[in-house]
């Protein structure tokens, strides 16, 4: 399997992916969904064969997150996280019924333990702590197609 690491630039995430994705109707894995805004763009722009969405939708209140984008906000409230999850299920209801979207309410580590699929695109925007990002990258490398791309967000 050929691995090429490069830093690419585009005016936005969708353009970056369009410039580099070499397959139509890709299998896509998105790690870190939050409210699903980017997930909605992925389904509309790429018409994936299947879109896998992975997020635990858990409110972390640890001091580690206190000064992060995630801490001290609605993102650290479990009721809000539950609402985000339910809203996402409602939005993707048709796609879930058609078996074009799978929503996994679990950590990416838990997802990868039982995953048997390979992906043309893996978009990583999960837990931003170094050890989690590192694991997401290492796990993703095991499940990406030869011409697939892995995109890291912030």
What are these regions (language model features)?
Residues 2-5, 14-154:
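S-adenosylmethionine/decaboxylated-SAM
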């Amino acid at each position: 399997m050929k691995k090429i690491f490069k830093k690419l630039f585009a005016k936005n995430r969708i353009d970056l992916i369009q410039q580099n994705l070499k397959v139509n109707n890709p299998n896509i894995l998105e790690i870190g969904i939050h409210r699903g805004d980017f997930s909605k763009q992925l389904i509309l722009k790429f018409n994936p064969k299947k879109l896998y969405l992975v997020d635990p939708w858990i409110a972390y209140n640890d001091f580690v997150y206190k000064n992060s984008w995630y801490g001290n906000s609605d993102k650290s409230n479990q009721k809000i996280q539950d609402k985000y999850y339910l809203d996402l299920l409602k939005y993707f209801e048709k796609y879930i019924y058609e078996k074009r979207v799978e929503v996994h309410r679990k950590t990416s580590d838990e997802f990868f333990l039982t995953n048997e699929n390979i992906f043309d695109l893996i978009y990583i925007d999960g837990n931003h702590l170094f050890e989690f990002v590192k694991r997401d990258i290492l796990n993703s490398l095991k499940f990406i197609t030869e011409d697939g791309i892995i995109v890291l967000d912030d």
